[in-house]
Amino acid sequence: MNKRNKVKHLNRNKGHRDALINNMITSLFKYERIESTQAKLKVVRSHAEKLITRAKKNLVTDLKPEVQLHNKREVMKRIKDREVVVKLFEDIAKRFETKNGGYTRVLKLVNRISDNSEVGILELTSRKERSTLLKERIEKREIQTKAREEKRATRKSNSAPVNKETTSKKK
């Protein structure tokens, strides 16, 4: 009798397995490519495809705001990083708008030397070039640093000058 075969356990308990899958999905959407063992990649692939489909549902214009919010919250159960969620809904979902599946692919690599495990790469099929990804990250960092500097400047200008007379000393 084959029991307990609906879920790939990956030799981990449920909490560890869920954390592993969530982290790998986040990395996949952030870097658009991850490398790991074949067994892990197959599990992550199914979850990632479901999340992309969920994000694509928000592209429909006549969708109720409650449904859009529900879709976003369902995705945020798996992906904790808000920047990655925004990227999924605004960038990745639009790239796959015309496709009805097959958003990811698993490429097999040579077995790992140390333990002879099957290794592969999971990547998005319509992946951006590495140079454009790096440019986007650099631009994003520059924008963030400018915002931080402006915030610091406003804090300095808004801080009231300290009046020595008003600060009371114990008499």
From Swiss-Prot:
Basic and acidic residues compositional bias: what residue ranges? 140-152
Q: Which domain of life is it from?
A: Bacteria
Which key words are in the record? Ribonucleoprotein, Ribosomal protein
> Ribosomal protein: present as a keyword of the record?
yes
A GO molecular function annotation here is: structural constituent of ribosome
One biological-process term from Gene Ontology? translation
User: Transmembrane ranges?
Assistant: none
Q: Which GO terms describe its cellular component?
A: cytosolic large ribosomal subunit
Q: Which Gene3D superfamilies match?
A: Ribosomal protein L17 (3.90.1030.10)
- Listed Polar residues bias regions: 156-165
Q: Where is this region: Disordered?
A: 140-171
* Cited Pfam families: Ribosomal_L17
Description of how the protein assembles with itself and partners:
Part of the 50S ribosomal subunit. Contacts protein L32.
Which family is annotated?
A: Belongs to the bacterial ribosomal protein bL17 family.
Q: What is this protein called?
A: Large ribosomal subunit protein bL17
The organism encoding this protein is Leptospira interrogans serogroup Icterohaemorrhagiae serovar Lai (strain 56601)
